[in-house]
């Protein structure tokens, strides 16, 4: 769902990003394919024309937004679980009825235009990923994330999650895992080369948080490939590094 929707694409990098929705192609109205294609083309042309006419404003907005991400001065809170909520409004849409060839008004009573965060985390300075975990290291390499070796310095604290239990949560009509976790100070030792350090002060910093937090709806742990990172009663292998 998240990959197909482009949520790990340009939008999360503070770029002006659009998703143009269309019919799913599963209907039987083949005779309407021309109108559907022309409708898609019209929408795409409108977006391109708008971008061309406002290119200076868009480029400046994107550049300013990306500077905030790279500097680490972005919003310290990151929502890793959210839901669509109602604000009490009803949505009225005027449509043309193919049956009667007249205008008709469709009223959406269960209208949920507000995106409401239900679980936030404070963005850490970065994460420590075990260098021996090939699957995680492959993920880091494929996304070309900025990382370095880590030397434990004064002024930072290291935390590790314990997986207390694993529940479930509805995510846009999909049921995904929702682990209950507890964060505590890391008491182990960190040898040279044991971990790589991925800072959140980089262009893909928000993506890093969404990917590596165990309660994230878009986290790596929601994929079968990384399911072994979550084990009830055990420690989560990725560590959080925060400034004291």
Task: Give the residues covered by each predicted segment.
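Hard-cation-handling environments
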Residues: 1-158
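Catalytic centers of hydrolytic enzymes
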Residues: 139-142, 148-149, 165-244
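Beta-rich nucleic-acid/ligand-interaction surfaces
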Residues: 153-169
């Amino acid at each position: 769902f998240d990959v197909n929707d482009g949520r790990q694409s340009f939008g999360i990098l503070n770029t002006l990003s659009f998703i143009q929705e269309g019919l799913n192609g599963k209907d039987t109205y083949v005779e309407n394919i021309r109108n559907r294609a022309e409708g898609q083309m019209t929408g795409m042309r409108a977006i391109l024309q708008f971008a061309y006419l406002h290119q200076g404003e868009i480029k400046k907005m994107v550049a300013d937004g990306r500077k905030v991400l790279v500097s680490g001065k972005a919003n310290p809170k990151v929502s890793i679980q959210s839901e669509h909520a109602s604000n009490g409004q009803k949505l009225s849409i005027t449509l043309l009825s193919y049956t009667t060839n007249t205008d008709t008004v469709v009223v959406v009573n269960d209208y949920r235009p507000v995106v409401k965060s239900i679980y936030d985390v404070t963005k850490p300075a970065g994460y420590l990923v075990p260098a021996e975990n090939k699957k995680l290291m492959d993920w880091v390499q494929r996304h070309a994330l900025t990382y370095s070796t880590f030397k434990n310095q004064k002024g930072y604290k290291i935390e590790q999650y314990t997986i207390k239990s694993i529940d479930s949560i509805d995510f846009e009509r999909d049921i995904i895992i929702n682990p209950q976790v507890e964060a505590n100070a890391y008491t182990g030792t960190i040898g040279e080369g044991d971990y790589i350090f991925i800072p959140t002060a980089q262009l893909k910093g928000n993506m890093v948080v969404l990917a590596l937090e165990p309660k994230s709806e878009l986290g790596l742990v929601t994929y079968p490939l990384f399911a072994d990172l979550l084990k009830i009663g055990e420690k989560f292998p990725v560590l959080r590094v925060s400034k004291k």
